[in-house]
């Protein structure tokens, strides 16, 4: 909100109008510098929703209608101007069932989109190798003790988003195929990987 943005970006907090007798707090930046401020917020681990005006000024009483047209998160930042030289900005998802642990990861810069099965004792090393800027986890789940996510932002999603059947539907629709046999993900042992990939795909398509 405006209070948090003003504090994080060191910009002026103002008020304009009232709602239920309480002043409405606002904070703004110059339009030409908006992308730079957006990148700063994302680098701090914040997710930013970009809205555009879609209603006509004076068309009715109350605020002009606006619509969310873009959501930027730590793992979906792609503008090379705001990334370190040669830095690949990855986002990953971790999922597990009773027998298997899986990681799916993607880079919106390069189009990379992969998934693999791993084990509990190797998960920390796999995540460290990927150096993902953002890691998606089901609610109630945590990363292994051996992994210290000093540079990764953890985003928790509803557990149903990691379901294998939902993931398979999303993946086959997106890639235009009847099943996941061609990707080597059609076995029971790959359900955790399909769930991770589906949750990741759904998130980055927002």
How should each PLM-predicted stretch be described?
Residues 1-206:
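Charged catalytic and DNA/RNA-contacting regions of genome-maintenance
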């Amino acid at each position: 909100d405006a209070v948090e943005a003003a504090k994080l970006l060191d910009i002026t907090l103002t008020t304009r109008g009232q709602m239920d007798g309480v002043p409405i707090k606002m904070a703004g930046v110059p339009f030409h510098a908006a992308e730079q401020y957006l990148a700063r917020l994302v680098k701090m681990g914040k997710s930013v929703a970009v809205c555009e005006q879609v209603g006509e000024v004076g068309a009715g009483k109350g605020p002009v209608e606006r619509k969310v047209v873009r959501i930027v998160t730590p793992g979906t930042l792609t503008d090379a101007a705001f990334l370190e030289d040669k830095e690949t900005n990855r986002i990953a998802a971790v999922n597990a069932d009773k027998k298997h642990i899986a990681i799916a990861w993607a880079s919106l810069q390069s189009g990379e989109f992969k998934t693999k099965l791993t084990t509990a004792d190797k998960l920390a090393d796999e995540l460290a190798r990927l150096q993902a800027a953002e890691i998606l986890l089901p609610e109630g789940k945590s990363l292994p003790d051996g992994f210290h996510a000093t540079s990764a932002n953890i985003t928790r999603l509803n557990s149903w988003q990691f379901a294998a059947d939902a993931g398979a539907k999303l993946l086959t629709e997106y890639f235009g195929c009847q099943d996941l046999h061609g990707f080597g993900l059609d076995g029971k042992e790959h359900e955790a990987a399909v769930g991770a990939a589906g949750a990741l795909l759904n998130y980055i398509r927002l």
